[in-house]
Amino acid sequence: MKLHGFLFSVLSTCVVILPALAYSEAVTMVKSIEQYFDICNRNDSYTMIKYYTSWCQHCKTLAPVYEELGELYAKKANKDDTPINFLEVNCEFFGPTLCTDLPGFPIIELVKPRTKPLVLPKLDWSSMKFHERLWQRIKTWFNNPKYQLDTSRVVRFEGSRNLKSLSNFIDTVRSKDTEERFIEHIFDDSRNCNEELRSQQLLCKAGKEYYSDTLSKLYGDVNGLEKERRRLEALIKQNGDDLSKEVKEKLKIIRLQLSLLSHIEDQLEDTSSHDEL
């Protein structure tokens, strides 16, 4: 980020005055850098962001679709869903700061929740003079996690900008992220399955048992892992047509076991690739 862009960011801690437009309550217009990062760096919600300009024709076409999307998720949210924030960033005001790396407009991105709490540096601002505070802000800007967004948490939408495609995009990213977090929970010995939703606790316990009794003993055994994969895939194939509730529950556990096995294989592959380098 260039210096003039940063200085713009510092000044923008004051609320930017934006044109008065009609927006639904489900979509929030970003008015400051502070507001943008405060929302995007939450660990309890997803954040959908639309970057746009007033002169972009595609942005004008997208505007009512995006508002409808925000309203749709506000209506269908239930207590077990992780909330989704819907933001709009006007890149005519935030071009030097929030929009510097964008290839064009409009751009839509979904930011996944943080997996760990945000740890901020502790500074004694009250003991500093004005120019010292300003200089300290400049020095810490690039390293302050409050004003950073981990790119691994950002998924960019690529597709037709209609309600169905955008809704499918959100559901797919959220479903995959939920599964990844669930798998990480199972591998984390310090975490208890009681932390999960009640509906997921039995599945979590089955996953931890499988990891402890089977996968932990196969770690590093490529042939053993491949044999176990074939066994699980055969079970799914043999019972895939059985619609009974009991078999469905067993298949759910087997598919989880397959996901855990894939996670182990990916880890081994990453380790192998790193060793080759």
Swiss-Prot record:
Disulfide bonds join C56-C59. It catalyses: Catalyzes the rearrangement of -S-S- bonds in proteins. Changing C56S: Loss of function. The keyword Iron does not apply. Its main location: endoplasmic reticulum. Transmembrane segments: none annotated. One of its GO terms (molecular function) is protein-disulfide reductase activity. InterPro entries: PDI, Thioredoxin-like_sf, Thioredoxin_domain. GO terms for cellular component: endoplasmic reticulum. Keywords: Disulfide bond, Endoplasmic reticulum, Isomerase, Redox-active center, Signal. Its EC number is 5.3.4.1. It is found in: Endoplasmic reticulum. Residues 1-22 form the signal peptide. Residues 27-172 form the Thioredoxin domain. GO terms for biological process: protein folding. Belongs to the protein disulfide isomerase family. Present with 1520 molecules/cell in log phase SD medium. Non essential disulfide isomerase, which participates in the folding of proteins containing disulfide bonds. May be involved in glycosylation, prolyl hydroxylation and triglyceride transfer. Able to fold proteins by being directly oxidized by ERO1. This is Protein disulfide isomerase MPD2. The gene is MPD2.
